[in-house]
Curated annotation (Swiss-Prot):
Domain EngB-type G: 24-195
Cofactor(s) this protein requires: Mg(2+)
Keywords per UniProt: Cell cycle, Cell division, GTP-binding, Magnesium, Metal-binding, Nucleotide-binding, Septation
Listed InterPro entries: G_ENGB_dom, GTP-bd, GTP-bd_ribosome_bio_YsxC, P-loop_NTPase
HAMAP family linked: GTPase_EngB
Family named by the database record: Belongs to the TRAFAC class TrmE-Era-EngA-EngB-Septin-like GTPase superfamily. EngB GTPase family.
UniProt-recorded name of the protein: Probable GTP-binding protein EngB
PROSITE patterns linked to this entry: G_ENGB
GO MF assignments: GTP binding; metal ion binding
Functional description taken from the UniProt entry: Necessary for normal cell division and for the maintenance of normal septation.
Record-level GO cellular component terms: cytosol
Binding site for Mg(2+): 39, 61
Length: 195
């Protein structure tokens, strides 16, 4: 899959089903805990610096952000989970919005769950992965921040994450660095398999 970085647009930031765009394109949702590097991942995959806004402030994304990727697919940036400073009522509101999207959206073909390669998956990571599996949602696990781990230890960290998530044999796990950006084509090819 080849992407023209000059043909990428944020279509809408939605908070309810009535606002979801009707594009006829397959959708790939990006999920992960706050500050796992979702925005950096999106920007590096599409070859743009600031398409998805990165933030030092966790819990910043509070909407479903729909990006048209070169009229080939839609990336949907989902609010990060597991950020304690978001109020309980806000968390419940996000949870309902995300659940509605993940379980009812027919154009959703894949969820990319991002986890931090440096750490064990959090309880929220495990809950999210189990949730996706419960609803039979195809999932690609991408371990971010690969550049922060010594090359010789990457496979050990991946194995650990696989075990902690109890990864489904049908799901793929891959490590990635938004800074080094060396596996971009490999990930596009994996995504294309689901569209």
């Amino acid at each position: 899959m080849n992407i023209n970085p000059n043909n990428i647009d944020l279509i809408i930031s939605a908070v309810q089903e009535a606002q979801y765009p009707d594009t006829g394109l397959s959708e790939v949702a990006l999920s992960g805990r706050s500050n796992v590097g979702k925005s950096s991942f999106i920007n590096s995959m599409i070859g743009r610096k600031n398409m998805a806004r990165t933030s030092q402030q966790p819990g910043k994304t509070q909407t479903l952000n729909f990006f048209n990727i070169d009229d080939q697919l839609i990336f949907v940036d989902v609010p990060g989970y597991g950020y304690a400073k978001v109020s309980k009522s806000q968390r419940e509101k996000f949870g309902k919005m995300i659940e509605e999207y993940l379980t009812k959206r027919e154009s959703l073909k894949l969820v990319i769950q991002l986890v931090d390669l440096r750490h064990n998956p959090t309880e929220d990571d495990v809950l999210m992965y189990n949730y996706l599996k419960h609803f039979d949602i195809p999932t690609l696990v991408i371990c971010t921040k690969e550049d922060k781990i010594a090359k010789g230890k990457i496979q050990k960290h991946i194995k650990n994450i696989k075990e902690k998530l109890d990864l489904d044999p049908d799901d793929t796990i891959i490590s990635y660095s938004s800074i080094q950006n060396t596996k971009q084509q490999q990930i596009w090819d994996l995504i294309a398999n689901y569209l």
